[in-house]
Amino acid sequence: MKKGILGKKHGMTQIFDEKGEVIPVTVIEAGPCVVVQKKTVEKDGYNAIQVGFGDVSEKKLNKPLLGHFKKAGVSPKRYLREFRLDDISGYEVGTEIKVDIFKPGDRVDVTGISKGKGFAGVIKRYGARRGPMSHGSKYHRRVGSMGATTDPGRTFKGKKMPGRMGSDRVTIQNLEVVKVDPELNLLVVKGSVPGPKGSLLIIRDSVKSK
């Protein structure tokens, strides 16, 4: 059965395996989450569970959201996300989802919002080559050609140009679960994941794992 959980990024560190080789890892506080709503094919057109994570004061929520949580009989949560599943019979509203749904050796996909870098040029944003730095060159780091002349007489959509960099939804696929700590709700995965410390992460079964 497919699995999913919400978490919060704690940061990166390194651990050693049985051979003494160092492994760069990311520590994630995963769960506990609670099922707030079930969606079915008959009523909603698809099967899914809505999951809440992170407690929040009632003062910070509007009336529709407060009513949503009261109907489910759960305390208000900061984050709400959906997981589409083929079979939701194992979940009921109020069911708690903990980090122990995963075990070492599992493969997961981690989704988050990447760090924002602000307005950036094409060299930083896309790795473009700079222009000549001497001999009378009038451009160094700016964009080169943006297209042809009279025909087509415009710059095509998708042309790589300066703009805001980062703050994108990014998914890192097929990360290995190195360690699971049910007591502290910690999930340790090999490699890096998107976003700054404290940012929301969505952890799912990997679509590439067999």
From Swiss-Prot:
The keyword RNA-binding applies. GO terms for cellular component: cytosolic large ribosomal subunit. Keywords: Ribonucleoprotein, Ribosomal protein, RNA-binding, rRNA-binding. Residues 131-165 are annotated as: Disordered. GO terms for biological process: translation. GO terms for molecular function: rRNA binding; structural constituent of ribosome. Gene3D superfamilies: 3.30.160.810, Translation factors. Pfam families: Ribosomal_L3. The keyword Ribosomal protein applies. PROSITE patterns: RIBOSOMAL_L3 (PS00474). SUPFAM superfamilies: Translation proteins. Part of the 50S ribosomal subunit. Forms a cluster with proteins L14 and L19. One of the primary rRNA binding proteins, it binds directly near the 3'-end of the 23S rRNA, where it nucleates assembly of the 50S subunit. Belongs to the universal ribosomal protein uL3 family. NCBIfam families: L3_bact. PANTHER family: 50S RIBOSOMAL PROTEIN L3, LARGE RIBOSOMAL SUBUNIT PROTEIN UL3C. HAMAP family: Ribosomal_uL3_B. This is Large ribosomal subunit protein uL3. It comes from Caldanaerobacter subterraneus subsp. tengcongensis (strain DSM 15242 / JCM 11007 / NBRC 100824 / MB4) (Thermoanaerobacter tengcongensis). The gene is rplC.
